Regions:
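Short acidic/glycine-rich loops and adjacent helix/strand connectors
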Residues: 1-150
């Protein structure tokens, strides 16, 4: 685990679906967050959020090597299995959709650690969160209520 001045930096990213983004936490507090479309001017930009990542790191005054962790918003194999089962239950109706989505999955989503390393030079482990738990956690942690449920 890398850290700067005993700080824990966690970079969260989402990409290859819609609205790619990055968010940087320092010791559990949000330092910076940005959607890739703010830099590329492409609405709902699904590409790897390299500009958003650079912005977050620059805001904190750190480099990619200072990250303690990098987290991806989804567990690609879990989602891939769910999609496969969905397509199989609707076959052959879903064949066209399946064929359109597979290049994205096979080329990028199933290889997130490699994509992250190639795009950023990050050499640490990539952590994966369960997509719907990530949504629930964002509501939980941002709630102003003293008691939270999800």
């Amino acid at each position: 685990m890398n850290s700067t001045k005993e700080n824990v930096f966690i970079l969260g990213i989402s990409c290859f679906y819609h609205d790619s983004a990055a968010c940087l936490l320092q010791d559990g507090n949000i330092v910076a967050a940005a959607q890739e479309e703010r830099f590329t001017r492409k609405k709902h930009d699904p590409r790897f959020p390299k500009h958003a990542i650079r912005y977050c790191l620059d805001e904190a005054g750190i480099d990619i090597t200072d990250l303690s962790y990098l987290a991806y918003y989804d567990k690609p194999f879990l989602t891939f299995e769910r999609l496969l089962m969905s397509y199989l239950t609707t076959a052959p109706r879903g064949l066209r959709s399946w064929l359109q989505s597979m290049p994205q999955w096979l080329g990028k989503k199933l290889h997130i650690p490699r994509v992250v390393r190639n795009e950023t030079g990050y050499g640490g482990d990539v952590l994966f969160t369960e997509h719907h738990e990530a949504h629930a956690a964002s509501a939980f942690y941002m709630s102003p209520l003293t008691r939270r449920r999800f």
